[in-house]
Amino acid sequence: MGAIPLEHGLAVAGILFCLGLVGLMVRRNILFVLMSLEVMMNASALAFVVAGARWVQPDGQVMFILVISLAAAEASIGLAILLQLYRRFHTLDIDAASEMRG
């Protein structure tokens, strides 16, 4: 069983990134926006791992760990903002977030 070719891995990462970007631009629900951001971050992490595996360097795996930790921080902060938005305005519409400015 061989390794995944670089072109295929980067193509999958690019497709996932584009799907996340479309979800980010199209959806108005903040939960789906957060999910789209997670897909985009995981796509970039996949690109790092594939490139690192191609050149037999551990840098791709190090960047993967960094991206995953950033994604966890982004998810926790995003979910905290989501909860406050829902408690205050009883909606998850991202346009209501502009009203959160004190």
Curated annotation (Swiss-Prot):
NDH-1 is composed of 13 different subunits. Subunits NuoA, H, J, K, L, M, N constitute the membrane sector of the complex. It catalyses: a quinone + NADH + 5 H(+)(in) = a quinol + NAD(+) + 4 H(+)(out). The chain crosses the membrane at residues 6-26, 30-50, 62-82. Keywords: Cell inner membrane, Cell membrane, Membrane, NAD, Quinone, Translocase, Transmembrane, Transmembrane helix, Transport, Ubiquinone. It is found in: Cell inner membrane. It is a multi-pass membrane protein. InterPro entries: NADH_UbQ_OxRdtase_chain4L/K (IPR001133), NUOK/Mnh_C1-like (IPR039428). The keyword NAD applies. GO terms for molecular function: NADH:ubiquinone reductase (non-electrogenic) activity; quinone binding. NDH-1 shuttles electrons from NADH, via FMN and iron-sulfur (Fe-S) centers, to quinones in the respiratory chain. The immediate electron acceptor for the enzyme in this species is believed to be ubiquinone. Couples the redox reaction to proton translocation (for every two electrons transferred, four hydrogen ions are translocated across the cytoplasmic membrane), and thus conserves the redox energy in a proton gradient. GO terms for cellular component: NADH dehydrogenase complex; plasma membrane. The gene is nuoK. It comes from the Bacteria. GO terms for biological process: ATP synthesis coupled electron transport. Its EC number is 7.1.1.-. Belongs to the complex I subunit 4L family. This is NADH-quinone oxidoreductase subunit K.
